[in-house]
Amino acid sequence: MSAGGAGGEAKGGFPPQTIMAIGAIGGLAGIYLGNFMPAQFSFFGGLGAICAMVWGADAVRRVASYGLGTGVPSIGMISLGMGIVAALFGLSVGGIAGPIVSFIAAAIIGAVIGVLANKVIGMGIPIMEQAMVEIAGAGTLVIIGLSVVIAGTFDYAEVVEYVVANGYIALIFIIGGMGILHPFNANLGPDEKQDRTLSVAVEKAAIALIITGFASSLHEGLMAAGLNIAVGVIIWAWAFMKYYGYVKRDSYAVVGTGLLPSAEELE
């Protein structure tokens, strides 16, 4: 079951502007590198998606700290919903500037939804408008970045053929949404820390790179797919160990419980 945050502004860690810069600049840089470099280096699109996913998870952390309840998963899903619309629109009309056009379109969509959430629905969260702009932008970059991993390019026709028409877009929607919504959901509470939360975002984003790496084998070949998977596994292992270290740091005690007792032992 999901729960909201503590009912106020998220505290501690890197300032939002720093995470935003990492997500937006890193996301776009990875997408363009993955597009222009040979297919073997399409994992750069995945690295861009990781940057964007961390940004999205931090935005969810900040807005959900005001208390969204079961809206924590919902806001992650809406980020990818906005992202798909903005990504396909921008790539279809923007040409080489497609990712940038998509990013701008996402910001506009996010702003509209943020205003509706606060002014019409009356959620009353001070940063809702800004957070929805950030979450929409991050979701869009995640969609495009993971599409580059699979298709090797952000060319609209190839993305439609190799990502949308065969249904991989649904896969990206789920794994991208989980990477944005799950980190705060897994760490929420009065002792939530930004570094612990965002380490989960990196870990989930690495899993997304691994999964899309497998999907890329059908179009890009085994060498490119192998590199995508290898990079994802390395990042996942690093992020998981960082997360485990943060858990031990923040826990009162880490103990082994052993195996669950059998029915006979409980009698």
From Swiss-Prot:
<dbReference type="GO" id="GO:0032259">
    <property type="term" value="P:methylation"/>
</dbReference>
<feature type="transmembrane region" description="Helical">
    <location>
        <begin position="221"/>
        <end position="241"/>
    </location>
</feature>
<comment type="pathway">
    <text>One-carbon metabolism; methanogenesis from CO(2); methyl-coenzyme M from 5,10-methylene-5,6,7,8-tetrahydromethanopterin: step 2/2.</text>
</comment>
<dbReference type="GO" id="GO:0006730">
    <property type="term" value="P:one-carbon metabolic process"/>
</dbReference>
<keyword id="KW-0812">Transmembrane</keyword>
<dbReference type="GO" id="GO:0019386">
    <property type="term" value="P:methanogenesis, from carbon dioxide"/>
</dbReference>
<keyword id="KW-1278">Translocase</keyword>
<feature type="transmembrane region" description="Helical">
    <location>
        <begin position="40"/>
        <end position="60"/>
    </location>
</feature>
<protein>
    <recommendedName>
        <fullName>Tetrahydromethanopterin S-methyltransferase subunit C</fullName>
        <ecNumber>7.2.1.4</ecNumber>
    </recommendedName>
</protein>
<dbReference type="InterPro" id="IPR005865">
    <property type="entry name" value="THM_MeTrfase_su_C"/>
</dbReference>
<feature type="transmembrane region" description="Helical">
    <location>
        <begin position="96"/>
        <end position="116"/>
    </location>
</feature>
<feature type="transmembrane region" description="Helical">
    <location>
        <begin position="19"/>
        <end position="39"/>
    </location>
</feature>
<comment type="similarity">
    <text>Belongs to the MtrC family.</text>
</comment>
<keyword id="KW-0472">Membrane</keyword>
<dbReference type="Pfam" id="PF04211">
    <property type="entry name" value="MtrC"/>
</dbReference>
<comment type="function">
    <text>Part of a complex that catalyzes the formation of methyl-coenzyme M and tetrahydromethanopterin from coenzyme M and methyl-tetrahydromethanopterin. This is an energy-conserving, sodium-ion translocating step.</text>
</comment>
<keyword id="KW-0484">Methanogenesis</keyword>
<keyword id="KW-0489">Methyltransferase</keyword>
<feature type="transmembrane region" description="Helical">
    <location>
        <begin position="75"/>
        <end position="95"/>
    </location>
</feature>
<keyword id="KW-0554">One-carbon metabolism</keyword>
<comment type="subunit">
    <text>The complex is composed of 8 subunits; MtrA, MtrB, MtrC, MtrD, MtrE, MtrF, MtrG and MtrH.</text>
</comment>
<feature type="transmembrane region" description="Helical">
    <location>
        <begin position="131"/>
        <end position="151"/>
    </location>
</feature>
<dbReference type="GO" id="GO:0030269">
    <property type="term" value="F:tetrahydromethanopterin S-methyltransferase activity"/>
</dbReference>
<keyword id="KW-1003">Cell membrane</keyword>
<keyword id="KW-0808">Transferase</keyword>
<keyword id="KW-1133">Transmembrane helix</keyword>
<feature type="transmembrane region" description="Helical">
    <location>
        <begin position="162"/>
        <end position="182"/>
    </location>
</feature>
<dbReference type="GO" id="GO:0005886">
    <property type="term" value="C:plasma membrane"/>
</dbReference>
